[in-house]
């Protein structure tokens, strides 16, 4: 017969010294590494009415969890036993025992109470006290994991075995519903961050993958599939074009001509001096974009490590963020990042300084325009890292 070892004893009681008796009450959870300094010396459950027997001890259960191969200590649990019961039933009151906190009310007799311990199949009682629990001490009110008997476990196992054939379809329905709930939660999270709702095409591909054409597929069904593919591609194009409808500070330029870096943020100049021709053409899909992004401040850094200035401009408010990033010289991505600074000024770079979607300029077909007055150019010194319009 297998031996079951419960974990509600102190460290010296672990191992092969027998099963630990069950406490009559639910344990206390103490948020301290030294519970004997927190528990009052008269903290005895008053569920029993005989004041002469309100005496006993709290047995400390040390707990820990392993995280990444390292032991992490958790808050200990304390289980109460009346004097003369429990794992230290032979110990005298106030005898020095490791992991034991002796408690008693005034007038209690220092002799065995005879109350015994909890039976295996019974539930623990919620302990009641005549005083308020100290800060950091709470009663664990969830059912004890050791309470269910072996017969109850067998009956539950038989019940699960008998209901297994009937639960196949509901289980698949639950899995399907859980997948839908996950997709809805992801879509809501993306929408709150400024992204658009994922397309149905993405949902179907995530669930079923890319369907393969059947041998018996009719030409009509093939045409239908081609139309569906064209519609999905058209929806992707609309999705990319939709970048221009977002606020300037929410755009994600990509490799599409209608929503690249130049369309979203204008051509490269002294105020927009990051990106070579290849990076500007591909935006967030550029080859080195993930490495570049590692050197860009996070949202929290922009909020809490920046100098933020607000200025009204008509019906809008301009927020100016000024921040700095200190990067070690041996950072693996710093070299590539620096190569992208002021890359548009190099002769080998061919940046589209003009709007690629603008009409071709033809002076012969245009009417003579009125000459605008010449105004003196005003030099403005800027120290703007990021603007939110």
From Swiss-Prot:
Annotated Acidic residues bias: 379-389
Gene Ontology terms for molecular function: identical protein binding; RNA binding
Post-translational modification: ADP-ribosylated. The ADP-ribosylation is retained in the virion during infection.
Disulfide bonds listed in the record: none
Region described as Disordered: 111-178, 194-264, 363-389
Chain residue ranges for the region called RNA-binding: 22-148
Domain CoV N NTD positions: 20-141
Record domain CoV N CTD: where: 236-352
UniProt region (Dimerization), positions on chain: 243-347
Residue spans of biased composition, Basic and acidic residues class: 159-178, 236-246
Job of this protein: Packages the positive strand viral genome RNA into a helical ribonucleocapsid (RNP) and plays a fundamental role during virion assembly through its interactions with the viral genome and membrane protein M. Plays an important role in enhancing the efficiency of subgenomic viral RNA transcription as well as viral replication.
Protein name: Nucleoprotein
Organism field: Human coronavirus 229E
Encoding gene (name): N
């Amino acid at each position: 017969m297998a031996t079951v070892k419960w974990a509600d004893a102190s460290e010296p009681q672990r191992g092969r010294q027998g099963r630990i008796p069950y406490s009559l009450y639910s344990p206390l959870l103490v948020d301290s590494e030294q519970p004997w300094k927190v528990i009052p010396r008269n903290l005895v459950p008053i569920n029993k009415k005989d004041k002469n027997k309100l005496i006993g001890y709290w047995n400390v259960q040390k707990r820990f969890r392993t995280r990444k191969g390292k032991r992490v200590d958790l808050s200990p649990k304390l289980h109460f036993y009346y004097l003369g019961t429990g794992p230290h039933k032979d110990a005298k009151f106030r005898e020095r025992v490791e992991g034991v906190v002796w408690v008693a009310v005034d007038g209690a007799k220092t002799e065995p109470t005879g109350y015994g311990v909890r039976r295996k199949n019974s539930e623990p009682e919620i302990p009641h006290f005549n005083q308020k629990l100290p800060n950091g001490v709470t009663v664990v009110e969830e059912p004890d994991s050791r309470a269910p008997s072996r017969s109850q476990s067998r009956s539950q196992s038989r019940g699960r075995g008998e209901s297994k054939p009937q639960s196949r379809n509901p289980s698949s329905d639950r899995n399907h519903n859980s997948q839908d709930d996950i997709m809805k939660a992801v879509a809501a999270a993306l929408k709150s961050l400024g992204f658009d709702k994922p397309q149905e095409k993405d949902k179907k591909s995530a669930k079923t993958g890319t369907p393969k054409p059947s041998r018996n597929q009719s030409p009509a069904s093939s045409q239908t599939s081609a139309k569906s593919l064209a519609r999905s591609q058209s929806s992707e194009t609309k999705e990319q074009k939709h970048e221009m409808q977002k606020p300037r500070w929410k755009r994600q330029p990509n490799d599409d001509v209608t929503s690249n870096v130049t369309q979203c943020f204008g051509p490269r100049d002294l105020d927009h001096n990051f990106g070579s021709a290849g990076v500007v053409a591909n935006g967030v899909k550029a080859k080195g974009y993930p490495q570049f992004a590692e050197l860009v401040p996070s949202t929290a850094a922009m909020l809490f490590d920046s100098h933020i200035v607000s200025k009204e401009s008509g019906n809008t408010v301009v927020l100016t963020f000024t921040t700095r990033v200190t990067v070690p010289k041996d950072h693996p991505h710093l070299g590539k990042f620096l190569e992208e600074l002021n890359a548009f000024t190099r002769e080998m770079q061919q940046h589209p300084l003009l709007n690629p979607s603008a009409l071709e300029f033809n002076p012969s077909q245009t009417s003579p325009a009125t000459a605008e007055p010449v105004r003196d150019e005003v030099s403005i010194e800027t120290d703007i890292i990021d603007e939110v319009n």
